[in-house]
Each structure stands twice: as structure tokens, then as C-alpha cells.
Amino acid sequence: DMENKRSFVRMDTLYKIEAEIVIIKIGDYIVRSEANKIVLKDISGNGVAFLTDKYIDLSKEITAEISFKLLNTDIELVGDLVRLETVGDPFDYLYGVKVSSGNLTEDEMYKLLMKTGVYFKNVTPENSSIWKEYKNLWVE
């Protein structure tokens, strides 16, 4: 049943998916930080985890915009940073984000993730005609 989608539809990014994050709210204060590059670790319909070398203090509620591209689809998400783990080299920190809104519905996001998983299942540099277009997603 699709009520439990979160348990079954989560894409661990075997590919390097670069994204940008902008902090838009700290506690009760509306802010707009500079965009910072991050690398997505996993994506689900209602959350993402990302890696960065930047420390973000989570003692206050932090809301951020995260944008990236997946299968030529621009994704823009807004959510609260809900967890922080220290992970070490080459990135220092892993953050979890609970998504509250975005340019896709949760169901549209799940469908895109399923499509992406099928699309990349057999992608290697040797067998893919799309390699040149997506080579920046490959873990080196």
C-alpha cells in the first residue's frame, strides 16, 4: 500500500548529485543566505539527506530551500533541517531535511524517484548513450 511509500521508495544516490542550499529561516527570523553547494546522499518523497563540509547549528529551527536536477527535471524543495551527523572525510557533516513543500507533490516525487532508479539501474560508462549527459553524476 502506498501509505508506506517512504519505507520503500528512497533513492540512495550511487551517483554524485550536486545541489544548492539556501537558508531561508532561522528560528522566527526570515533570512536569505548565499547559495552553498551540497551533495545529496539520499532522496525520498518527503525528505533528503545531504553532505557538506559546512557546519550548521541546529539549536534553532532551520528552514532551507534545496534545488537540484534529476532526469532533466528541476527540483525545488523547502524543508526543516532535522538531524546532523558527523561523518568525516571528504565531507564533515550529514544533514537530514524533512520536506514541507516543493515544486512537485510527494507522489510526483516518488514517481520520479522510481523512474530514476529504473533509468540508472544499468548505467555504466561503457554501455550508456546518456553517459556524456550524466557523467557529472557518476561517483569517481
Q: Where do the protein language model's features map onto the residues?
A:
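Short, conserved beta-turn/loop elements at beta-strand boundaries and strand-helix junctions
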Residues: 22-24, 45, 84-90
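Short solvent-exposed strand/turn elements
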Residues: 22, 91-112
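N-terminal helix initiation/capping motif
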Residues: 1-43, 116-140
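Extended Gly/Ser/Thr-rich low-complexity repeat segments
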Residues: 60-63, 107-118
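Short beta-strand-centered aromatic/proline hotspots
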Residues: 77-84
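Short conserved beta-strand and strand-loop elements enriched in small hydrophobics
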Residues: 17-22, 60-74
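Hydrophobic core residues within well-ordered beta-strands of beta-rich domains
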Residues: 13, 36, 62, 75-77, ...
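Short strand-loop-strand
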Residues: 25-65, 96
